[in-house]
Amino acid sequence: MTTAPVVSPSLSRLHSAPASPFPKAPVGSGAGVAFPARPYGPSLRLRSAVMAASGVGGNGSPMAPEESAVSSRLGEVKRVTKETNVHVKINLDGTGVANSSTGIPFLDHMLDQLASHGLFDVYVKATGDTHIDDHHSNEDIALAIGTALLQALGDRKGINRFGHFTAPLDEAAVEVILDLSGRPHLSCGLSIPTERVGTYDTQLVEHFFQSLVNTSGMTLHIRQLAGNNSHHIIEATFKAFARALRQATEYDLRRRGTIPSSKGVLSRS
């Protein structure tokens, strides 16, 4: 004689699937589950406000432009002379997208470093009298980038203003210190051992930064700490510059809305 198993009422309740409080979506319909709305309390509002002000999302990643209350800072310059035709666009709040075609391959490579390590979106298109040499194109591109940077910074409210970074590249190491002060000054302490990297005249490195400083109105110090490979020294310089510029242009949460100067203004002198 077989006896039917006895199931405890409490055990039955334990193993039975509870009714879901959420409506079921039809299989294959692609409809999502409707979750009940949660109250948006003061603590959650405060946390969201802090994240928005600091440009950080809920997972700690940088916020996309649509998530942040701060609009992207953009600059665009077209410079046309009898020697060159230059078009530059820069987004200080970008993602590191580079689109450069300058007619100078090594300079394109360096502008890629500026975008990638600064997390700036950088667009540079240029044609010029490179059949003579790269001097005019190199200079006018830097002048246009500096002017676009000046536009993008606007009144400079809330930014860190200062940047400092040391970048190594194998045996080379270069330190960059900068101040978005409105006062153009360059001190360049590079010792590049060869006259050229590829077809690029290495004298043009200092001239590039001098031209950029002149139109952007920044104070820039470049100091070579080590290095004997010309390519490495120059690339470490651009990487350190990009990182320092990123620091200087990013927002200081405690200073949001105010100009980072004791005199209350940052302008070209």
From Swiss-Prot:
Keywords: Amino-acid biosynthesis, Chloroplast, Histidine biosynthesis, Lyase, Manganese, Metal-binding, Plastid, Transit peptide. The keyword Plastid applies. Pathway: Amino-acid biosynthesis; L-histidine biosynthesis; L-histidine from 5-phospho-alpha-D-ribose 1-diphosphate: step 6/9. Mn(2+) 2 binds at H135, E139, H207, H232. It is found in: Plastid, Chloroplast. Its main location: plastid. It comes from the Eukaryota. Substrate binds at residues 83, 109-117, 135-139, 161, 183, 231-239, 261-263. One of its GO terms (cellular component) is chloroplast. Mn(2+) 1 binds at H109, H136, H231, E235. Its EC number is 4.2.1.19. It is an enzyme of class 4 (lyase). GO terms for biological process: L-histidine biosynthetic process. Its cofactor is Mn(2+). It catalyses: D-erythro-1-(imidazol-4-yl)glycerol 3-phosphate = 3-(imidazol-4-yl)-2-oxopropyl phosphate + H2O. CDD domains: IGPD. One of its GO terms (molecular function) is imidazoleglycerol-phosphate dehydratase activity. Residues 1-51 form a transit peptide. Binds 2 manganese ions per subunit. The keyword NADP does not apply. Belongs to the imidazoleglycerol-phosphate dehydratase family. This is Imidazoleglycerol-phosphate dehydratase 3, chloroplastic. It comes from Triticum aestivum (Wheat).
